[in-house]
Amino acid sequence: MTTAAAAAGRSGGAGETTSKSTTSTTTVVTTTSDTAARRAETRAAAYWSRHIRSFRAGTRRWLTVMHGRPVGSSRSLAAHSVHGLRLLARTWRHREHAAWWRATHPPHLHAWNCIHHYEGSWTDSGGPYWGGLQMDLSFQSTYGGWLLRHKGTADHWSPLEQIWVAVRAAHSRGFSPWPTTARSCGMY
C-alpha cells in the first residue's frame, strides 16, 4: 500500500507532525501547520465577530434612544470569511459612530436645554408632569410608549431620551406643549 500521501507522511518535513488515520484503503495526512492555520483563522473570525456584535449593540442602543423603541435583530455572522468579517466590522463601527452622533445631537438641542432650564429637573417626579420637559402621562404614552412601558415615567429616562420624545412630539404637534417657554427659548 504505497500511496503518495503515505510516502509524504513517512518523509515528515521539518517542523511537521503527521497523524494518519486509515479507513479501508484511504489514507488521510494532517500536518500541524494546517491545524495551526485553521486555529489562527478561527481566532481571527471570533475576534472580528465579537467586535461586530459590540458595534451592532452600540448602534441598536443609540437607535433606541432616537426612536424610543428597539430596532430589529441582525443576521448571522457564520457565513463570512475573516476578510469579510473585517470589512463588516468596519461598516458597523461607522454605523455605530453615525448613530451615536445623530443621537447625541438632536434637532434644536440648545433650545430643548433652555426649555428644561425653565420647566424642571430631568428627574422631576412630581404631580401630573414628569421629567425635565414636564411631560404628562398621555404625552409620554403617545410619544414615548415603549420607554414608558419599559422604564417607567419620564423622570427615569435619560435627558437624551426625553429630548427625542419631545422631538417626535414637536414633529407632529409643534411646540404647543411648551407655548410660553418654547417662544422665549427661540423655537417659534
What are the functions of these language-model segments?
Residues 100-188:
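Peptidoglycan cell-wall recognition and remodeling modules
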